[in-house]
Amino acid sequence: MFTWKRVRYGVMFGFLAYISWVGYQHQTLGGGPEGIPTVDSLCPLGGLESIYGYLTSGAWLRRVAPSSLILFIAVAGITLLVGRVFCGWICPLGSIGEFCNLAARKLGIRRRELPPALDRALKMVKYAVLAVILYFTWTWGTLAWRSYDPWVSWMHLASGWEEMVASPWGYVVLFFVVIGAGLFIERCWCRYLCPLGAALGILQKFSLTKVRRTKETCISCSKCDRSCAMGITPMALEEVTDADCIAGGRRT
């Protein structure tokens, strides 16, 4: 039976498998003309981080390539057109967190939801994280966030224990927040801490496409509320304008 949920899971798994293979290949073959692109050249956040330096001095941050800026512009453009589909359909960290939560529920671990007031407060943290990252990156002229970035850690898993010992904090975030906390609170990283999600959440407010509830056919079953990976309650709204909406389509 065709459902958008199955299509989405297929797309998520495909992108996660591909980008994980790219990370493995980079660790085994190395970079350079004969190798595989670096982790940083494939990260849209790096494009946002490098904008200030490029505009003021014409130079890229170390490790960042023009591809990062191209990716960020593309993702930002898609967000303005159809919402945060990058977060809901493509982002590897989002997929890891969501798949881990699905596995946890299959094993009988109950999904948890924080009290609404606490949830709203914590959702503001990612904007502070974004502001801090941009401030120190633009001030220092280097990728200040890199040592704490779970995306970098995921792409370096093939490097083994030596990499984990040399740069442990990113792995702490990966294993304890993206995966660990994500077992109980679905997409915990995405909801509360992701800096790229914060940037795209701002753009989401201006998106031309919004998720809408059709009152004439809605039977008030609350399925959309229960299935939303980001803890939004679409049934209480006619049009979902929440910055955290990732167009997951799990209600269908």
Predicted features along the sequence, with ranges:
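Non-ligating segments of multi-cofactor redox enzymes
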Residues: 1-238, 243-244
